[in-house]
């Protein structure tokens, strides 16, 4: 996911409301009769960034669009504000957000004066962006401050495209092995196994009993829904009466491109979709196994 190189397949750019506040970043009262110099060091941008890919994990929701745990990347942050009866706007680019730039400079505070540095901070899904902008104000000690006020704050973020149940075509990728679920013929049934081809597509459905995984690449007409056999192998069945077709996904809706999930069978309740080196195929549903799978939206 990278906004610098254009929007990658499976992702989209959306605009969301975010929280921005003005804070007193630095305050100094010079009660002497001569000017005082002070060195100030600030960090502009995101602090404590640990992601080399710039992909962040939301620690709290962003409106109704992003839920806790969702992955996203910040493209821009824009804040409009008022100060001293004037309205202004400040923008921070992707580079400025992620570079976490340290700035040090010296200020001079006149005698019997108070220096206040206002800093504009923004919170985007738990990512704390400091010193988007700053305003320096010098007033007499005890004088009235002109406190800046945020009018509107929004961010453009990159997120995985939403997976619409019953509609969006996806690939299902094993998170550790980096191979895709494919469909082969075994015992005159379509069966799931891992492979490197990206041509195999699936659609997720949900009803009151759980999720179903439908293949769009069956070689036996009508045999489309993944279920666990009693021995654990994954085959594709017809109709909707088989309770072994139902799965639980460990993530709340909406699902998005790039989500990492597990599939637990609703019939064999302690068994999960996993890799197993079987005699002919290697996608199984086994007891106490909860392998992780990556959902990838297929480009329309």
From Swiss-Prot:
Residues under site feature: Crucial for binding sphingomyelin and inducing hemolysis: 22, 247, 293
Sites marked Crucial for binding sphingomyelin and important for inducing hemolysis: 189
Subcellular location: Secreted; Target cell membrane
Name this protein carries in UniProt: Lysenin-related protein 2
Tissue-by-tissue expression: Expressed by coelomocytes.
A GO molecular-function descriptor: toxin activity
Primary localization: secreted
Sites marked Important for activity: 211
GO CC list: extracellular region; membrane; other organism cell membrane
The keyword tRNA-binding appears for this protein: no
Signal peptide: none
Region N-terminal cap domain: start-end pairs: 12-35, 110-158
Disulphide bonds in the chain: 274-285
Highest taxon of the lineage: Eukaryota
Function recorded in the entry: Pore-forming toxin that specifically binds sphingomyelin in the plasma membrane of various cells. Has hemolytic activity. It also has antibacterial activities against B.megaterium.
BP GO terms, sorted: defense response to bacterium; killing of cells of another organism; monoatomic ion transport
């Amino acid at each position: 996911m990278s906004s610098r190189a254009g929007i990658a397949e499976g992702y989209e750019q959306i605009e969301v409301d975010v929280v921005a506040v003005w804070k007193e970043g630095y305050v100094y009262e010079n009660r002497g009769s001569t000017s005082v110099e002070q060195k100030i060091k600030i960090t502009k941008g995101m602090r404590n960034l640990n992601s080399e890919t710039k992909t962040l994990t939301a620690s709290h929701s962003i409106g109704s669009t992003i839920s806790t745990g969702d992955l996203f990347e910040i493209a821009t942050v824009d804040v409009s504000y008022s100060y001293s009866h004037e309205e202004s706007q400040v923008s921070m680019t992707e580079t400025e957000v992620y570079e976490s730039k340290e700035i040090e400079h010296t200020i001079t505070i006149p005698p019997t004066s108070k220096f206040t540095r206002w800093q504009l901070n923004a919170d985007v899904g738990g990512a704390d962006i400091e010193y988007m902008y700053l305003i320096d104000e010098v007033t007499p000690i005890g004088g009235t401050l002109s406190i800046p006020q945020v009018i509107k704050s929004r961010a453009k973020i990159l997120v995985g495209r939403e997976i619409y149940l019953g509609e969006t075509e996806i690939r299902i990728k094993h998170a550790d092995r980096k191979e895709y679920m494919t469909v082969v013929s075994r015992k005159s049934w379509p069966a799931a196994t891992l492979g490197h081809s990206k041509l195999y597509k699936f659609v997720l459905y949900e009803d009151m009993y759980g999720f179903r995984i439908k293949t769009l690449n069956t070689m036996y007409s009508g045999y489309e829904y993944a279920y666990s056999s009693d021995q654990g192998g994954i085959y594709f069945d017809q109709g909707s009466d088989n309770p072994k077709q139902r799965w639980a996904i460990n993530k709340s809706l909406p699902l998005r491109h790039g989500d990492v999930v597990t599939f637990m069978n609703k019939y064999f309740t302690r068994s999960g979709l996993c890799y197993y080196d079987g005699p002919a195929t290697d996608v199984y549903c086994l007891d106490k196994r909860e392998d992780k799978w990556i959902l990838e939206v297929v480009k329309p």
